[in-house]
Amino acid sequence: MSLPDHPSTKPEVSKDGSVHRTKVLLLGTRRSGKTSIQQVLFNDLPPKQTFYLEPTMRVTQHLYDAKGNSTIIPLELWDCPGNITVDTLGAPLSDFSTVVFVVDIRDNYQQPISKLVEFVAGAYDVNPGINFEVFIHKAEKLQEDDKIENFRQIQERVTERLADESPEYEQVALNFHLTSVYDHSLQEAFSRVLHKLIDSLEFIEGLLNVFCSNTSSPKAFLFDTTSKLYVATDSSPVDQATHTLCCDYLRMLSSFAPLYKSNAASEPRVHALSPTPTPPPTATSSSPASTSSARALLSQSPSDEPSSGVAKKSLFYPSAAASLSPSHPGTTLTYHLVTPHLALLALLPTTVYEMRKGLVEWNVVWLREGIREIWEVEKTRSTTTHFT
Amino acid sequence: MGASGSGKTSMRSMIFSNNPASLTERLGATIDVEQNHVRFLGDLILNLWDCGGQEAFMESYLHQQRSTVFSAVGVLIYVFDIETRELGRDLEYFRECLEGLRQYSPAASVFLLVHKMDLVREGERAAVLARKREELERASGGKGVTVFGTSIYDETLYKAWSGIVHTLIPNASTLSRHLRIFADACSANEVVLFERTTFLVIATSSSSAPAPVDGGDISAAEAAAAAAPDETALNPKRYERTSELIKAFKQSCSRLREEFHSLEMELAEFTAVLDEMTKNTYVLVIVHNPVVETAAIKMNIRIARRKFEELQGDNTPS
Ligand SMILES: Nc1nc2c(ncn2[C@@H]2O[C@H](COP(=O)(O)OP(=O)(O)OP(=O)(O)O)[C@@H](O)[C@H]2O)c(=O)[nH]1
Ligand SMILES: Nc1nc2c(ncn2[C@@H]2O[C@H](COP(=O)(O)OP(=O)(O)O)[C@@H](O)[C@H]2O)c(=O)[nH]1
Ligand SMILES: [Mg+2]
C-alpha cells in the first residue's frame, strides 16, 4: 500500500500545516503559576518545590517532542513572563493551537481578565480556531464553596468583558478548568487540553470503548507514562477520584520498578506466551477501528506488516494489577504497557481479572495493535509535516 | 521524648494512624503525655507515650512524674529537631532522661532521631548527620544509642521505625530463618515481610548482600555500599522506600473508599507479588527469574500462610 499525499489531504489539518498544532502558549499575570505548571507537569518538580521558582524574565520554549516517541503529540510549550503582550511575544498568534491562560483564583481579576481579553482579540483576527484554556489556578487554597463561587464569577466576568468588546469574540473557544499543582486536577485539565490536539483521538477512544465493553471495565485510561497525562479515555465520565488513583498508581509503579532491579540480572525478558495478535472474536463486529474512516487511516501505516511478525513476539510488555477491596465484587486496577510510552490503566471487576485473564489479555493485545497502527500514522504525519 | 515541635506526634500519626505528611501541619502541641496502645503484629501491644515537649512538661517528667515516666520503659525515642536553636538545653534534658532510664529501666534501648532532615540540603545530609551522630553519641556517655536521620517527607521515617520495632519483636530470628526457607521455595531474590497496618519492615531475606533491619548494622551496610558503588548492588534504600510507596498508595485507595489488598507485577526486570501473608503481615516476593510466574508465587504464599500464622502464634506470651 502506498502512502497517499499526506497530510494536505486531511481535512482537519489547517492549511498552514500541522506544525502549528503543537505550539502551546502559557500566559498569565506574574506569580500566577505558569512556570510551576510547566515544571510540575513535565519536569516532575515536587509541588512544594515550586515555592522556590525564580520569576520568568524571558519567553522560554520547552520542547516535548517525539524524541524517543515520548509523547503522542510533539509539544512546544512557551512559558512567558507576566508582562508579555501580543506584540512582544515574538511570534504571531497564528502559530499557536492553544493558549493556556493561568489565573490565580485569589487574585483581583481585573488585570488578568484584561490581559486575556487582549489576547483573545489579538488571536481572533489571525487564528479564530485557537483554543483558549483558562486555568483557574491554586484552587486548593480555597474551601469548596468559595472555589466554585470564584470559578463561576471569573467565567462570568470574562464572558461579559468579551461581549462588551465585540460580539464576534463569542466564537472563540474558551474553556475553564480549576487547577492546582497540589493534586491531580492540573494533570486532568492539561490532559483535556491535549485531547483537542490529537487528531486520532476518536479512534483511540473507540478502541478503549471496545476494551471496556469486552472486559466489563467501568473505566480505562491510556496514559503517557512520562508525563503521566492521559491521552485518551473511554466515553464514560471521568471521576476525579478514579483519575487520581490511576495517577498515583502509575507513579507508584514507576518508582517501584527501579528499586528491585539488579544490574546483574540476565538479558531482557521475553514474554512467555505471546498470543497472536488478532482481534478477539467479541471485538471484531463492534470495533470502531473497522469503520471505513478508521480503516483508511490505519491502512496508511508504512510498517503495515502482518501484525504477528517475529520481531514483535520477542517484545516484553510489563504489566501489573492491584486488587482493591472491599467493594463488591472487588475491583482490580490493571496496568499494561501498550507502547514503550503509553500504558493502559483499567478498572476491572476482580472476577473478570481472575477468572477470565485470557480474555483480558486478548483485548490488551488487540488494543495494543490498534494503538500501534494509529501511532505509526501519527508519526509519519508529524515527520512529513516537519519537512513541509 | 523531645523538644516541642520537634515532630514526635507527626511521626506517630503517620506510622500508626496512616495519616499523610500534609496533615501533620494541623497538629497542635501535645499536652502532657498522650498514651496510645497500638497493636503491632496483632498480639504485640505497644504502649506509646507521646510526651509533650514544652518545658513545663519536661520538668515534670524529670521530677514529679519521674518514676511513672521512666519505669518499665522498653524503648526511649528521643527526637532532636535538626533546626533547633536550643541544642544545649535539648541535650541537657536528654542526659537527664538517660539518667532516669538508668535508674528505673536500665535495659531500655535508646533511639535518637535527628528529625526534619529534609530541611538540610540534600548533598549535605550525610555529613550533617555524621556530625550530629558523633555529638549525640558523646552526649550519651557510654550508653549504647542508635542514631537515625529522619524526615516525614521521605523513606527515612520508615527505616528508623523499622529499626525501632525490630528490637521489640520477640522471635525475629526464627522469623528470618523461615523467611529464608520460603524465599528458597519461591526462587525469590528478595522476600520482605511487613507489618500490616504500619507497613514497617519486620524481616527480610535477600539472595544478594545481607541487609539486616536492625539499626546498628544498617549504617554499616550502607557505608559499605557507599564506599564501593558496586554495579550489581541493589538499591540500599529499597525496603524503606517500599514501605513509603505502599503506604502512600494505600492512602490513595482509601480516598476512593477502597482498601488496598494485593499487588502483582511483571516488569521488565522482575516479577513481584505483594500479598497478605498472615492476618497481621504482608509479604513482598521479588523474583528475577523470568520463568517464575505470579500465579506460582501466589500459590507459594498461600501454602506458607499456615506456617507463618503458627510462628506468629508462638509469639504470644501466654
Ligand atoms: N520540614 C519538616 N517538618 C516536619 C517534619 N516532621 C514534623 N514536621 C512539622 O513540625 C511541626 C510540629 O510537629 P509535632 O509532631 O506536632 O511536634 P511534637 O514533637 O509532637 O511537639 P509537642 O507535642 O509540642 O512536643 C508540624 O508543623 C509538622 O508538620 C519533618 O520531617 N520535616
Ligand atoms: N497554593 C498554590 N501555590 C501555587 C500553585 N502553583 C504555583 N503556586 C505558587 O505560585 C508562585 C508563583 O509561581 P510561578 O510558577 O513562579 O509563577 P509564574 O510567574 O506565573 O511563572 C510560587 O510561589 C508557587 O509555589 C498551586 O497550585 N497552589
Ligand atoms: Mg506533639
Where are these regions (language model features)?
Chain A
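Short, flexible boundary segments at extreme N-termini or domain junctions of P-loop NTPases and their
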Residues: M1-T29, H62-A66, A163-S166, T179, ...
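Conserved nucleotide-sensing/catalytic segment adjacent to the nucleotide-binding pocket
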Residues: L63-S97
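Inter-motif core of Ras-like GTPase G domains
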Residues: T85-P112, L116-N127
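Canonical P-loop GTPase G-domain recognition
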Residues: I130-F132, E140-K219, V238-T242, D248, ...
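A charged amphipathic helix-loop-strand protein-protein interaction module that recurs
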Residues: I204, P237-L333
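Short hydrophobic/glycine-rich mini-motifs in sensory/regulatory modules
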Residues: L337-L345
